Amino acid sequence: MPTIQQLIRTERKTLKTKTKSPALRGCPERRGVCTRVYTSTPKKPNSALRKVARVRLTSGFEVTAYIGGIGHNLQEHSVVLLRGGRVKDLPGVRYHIVRGSLDTAGVKDRRQSRSKYGAKSPKE
């Protein structure tokens, strides 16, 4: 613990927190273009084929983003909107693609949690 004299001489350094989504540059979302759409396998206890895309952002970064929901219409050169949020069992995937905006279609026949997947209200 420093003495009062030491604190007068040099003030305490403020701790800088590292951002978990540096490619967004402090913005809530970023636009980008898909350079590659593929599937990836998750870490050890889980087993699946997770849908991911490599995206070049307007901020100049190229990142890997997760495509949530069942089925998607993305291919190379699709324009997508990216938000933060990692996928715990996919190393290096720190972003999510926003469903139902730009070239990304919403999930078909989705009835619950529709706003998260860009699905319209079901007609009855």
Swiss-Prot record:
One family name in Pfam for this protein: Ribosom_S12_S23
Chain segments carrying region Disordered: 103-124
Keyword Transmembrane helix: no
InterPro entries: NA-bd_OB-fold, Ribosomal_uS12, Ribosomal_uS12_bac
GO CC aspect terms: small ribosomal subunit
GO MF, one example: tRNA binding
Cited SUPFAM superfamilies: Nucleic acid-binding proteins (SSF50249)
Residues recorded as bearing 3-methylthioaspartic acid in the entry: 89
Keywords associated with the record: Methylation, Ribonucleoprotein, Ribosomal protein, RNA-binding, rRNA-binding, tRNA-binding
Role: With S4 and S5 plays an important role in translational accuracy.
Family: Belongs to the universal ribosomal protein uS12 family.
The protein's assembly and partners: Part of the 30S ribosomal subunit. Contacts proteins S8 and S17. May interact with IF1 in the 30S initiation complex.
Protein name: Small ribosomal subunit protein uS12
Species in which this protein is naturally found: Prochlorococcus marinus (strain NATL2A)
